[in-house]
Amino acid sequence: MSMIEFHDVNKYFGKFHALKNINLTVDRGEVVTIIGPSGSGKSTLLRCINGLERITSGQLIVNDFDLADKKTDMNRIRKNVGMVFQHFNLYANKNVLQNVTLGPDLVLKRNKQEVEQEAHDLLKMVGLENKADSFPGELSGGQQQRVAIARSLAMQPKAILFD
């Protein structure tokens, strides 16, 4: 069963044709890597899957929802599709634990104690259990990336996109 389907998807930024007639199916549980030079549309493709960019034409189905349909609840899509950005987008004024727990607490409205325990487990999984009280500015780039991964996993998504 497919998780993501592109059918003749195009994306324009003004006159620039960023995605041209993309056809791709990603099945549940499948791992896919998109490679290409800088500026080839990899980030744009991921941002379309997560609903951060709208496609210009074609059909994009994510988890059985048609993203070209303006009635589709994009927040519901984003709850099920995690994203780890190139620049991680961590909150500089929040410590590592707060960065990981913010989504499940505010967006999913989950029990704060459960969320914190799961966050500690995730931080242990990514080798940062001793950094829960540190702030992003105190971490190396690799450590920040692992916090971003833990933060994405904390939302229990059905898919995770890595840019």
Regions found by a protein language model. Give the residues of each.
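ABC family nucleotide-binding domain
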Residues: S2-F162
